[in-house]
Amino acid sequence: MTRVARHLTLKTSMACLSLSLALFCGAGSAEQDSPLGSLQSGIVTSPEEQAMGREFIAAARKQLVFIDDPLLTEYVSALGQRLSRGLVGDTDSLRFFLINSPMVNAFAGPGSRMAVFTGLVTATQTEAELASVIAHELGHVAQRHLPRMMERSRQRKLPTTAAMLAGILLGGQVGAAAMAATSGAAVADQLNYNREYEREADVLGLRILTDAGYPASATIQFLKRLDQETRLQSSGAPEYLRTHPLTQNRIALVESRIRQYPDFAEPPSLDFYHARVRIQALYGAGGADSVLANFTHHLDSTVTIDARAARYGQVLTLIRFGNYDEAIKLASDLHRDFPEDVSYRLVLADALLQSGQVEDAVSHLETLALETPESTVVAYYFADALMKAGRFEVSRKVLRRTIRAAPSNAFLYRLMARVEGEAGNLPQSFQALAEFYFLQDEVSRAIGALQHASTLVSDNAYLEASITSKISELEALQPSKP
């Protein structure tokens, strides 16, 4: 396939995905609607919806690049969990993903799967603005817009929803053909309901946002800035406004609702600033000089938190491009100036580790782990350093203890797979890898890893039985084939 053809295929696939997500977030209902802004619907995720969610994410992984950085994924998940605390129902089923894309977008997919694009994080100016978008998506989930849309489609015998989902699942040119075959009157019919669902998600999103301690005004600040930037650009609306249409009526409704909430100044969030610069440093386009330039003009900022974050971004960029000596120097300066900040201690340890100073990194992280026993991220970095130092048994113990406290953290299992593999325990390595795949909604790959693990087991009846049982459990989750 030529470069041009690949580019067109990607653009077509993304168009399919964007249109489908717009439909997911807006359509009619055959269920009884909850009162506007009510939390009574709550989070309800049936086994069928969970299965669809797994299929959806597995298919999305073929079209999009998912971020696997433990610090960034923990930040997005923690923000989502903070916002969902005021909701009722099965909030444990909520899953948050971070996608590496410059598009300003976020979506709520089936099975309470929610995705945030890195372009959205870097486009927002405060954590409250980012939280306002996630709160809006939680509003879609709490009001069960996707299940209501699908039920209405079934009752009206409209194949659009299933075909649009198939367009995502098939992907590429085949998916585009499936989308095109059903994107006529049925799509227009369902989009007529988008406005009502956006209204519900706006109203409920404001409640979710303010219940989590954020100012409601952040919602309109972000929407108006996006709208203004759209008018000044010739490239069209950001993806978020294409999937969440912004009309004057919608702006007026949000503004009228905001007046019901007390306004206050949001204290700046260092975690948010760190997340933004981490995205720019680790995933920004261009060479070292180009990426470093993103932070240079912030170093003399009168906003202390902005200057701090810029220094952090510099260190991350230097590590990314292999300038470890300079990274260690700047990270040490940051740690000296702000000794209480865990992020700076982690980035110093990372610079030491990448430069080959493994024992220094282990010593540094061991001290930090003792001071922050509840931190999953610190435990992850400590276990990783122990593995690279060849201390596999200690690394395994750290991971086992951390997994007991955070059993749904996929990256712990991925690291455990590496530790077991380095230690020569191949069946256990593939067993841990299967858990990682499962938590990433890649059930087929999880089954494959377990099947491979079963071929490596010898003289261990308990382990073999455990693997066989898990294979059966996962096979039961697979969609039945016609």
PLM features: what roles do these ranges have?
Residues E31-Q32, L36-I43, R54, F66, ...:
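Extracytoplasmic and endomembrane cell-envelope/extracellular-matrix remodeling and assembly machinery
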Residues A115-S132, Y193-E196:
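Short pre-active-site segment immediately N-terminal to the catalytic Zn-binding motif
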Residues L158-Q173, A177-A188:
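Membrane-active amphipathic alpha-helices enriched in small hydrophobic residues
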Residues V116, S132-H140, R144, A201:
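Active-site recognition of the HExxH zinc-binding catalytic motif
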Residues A128, L138-Q155:
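Catalytic Zn2+-binding segment of zinc metalloproteases
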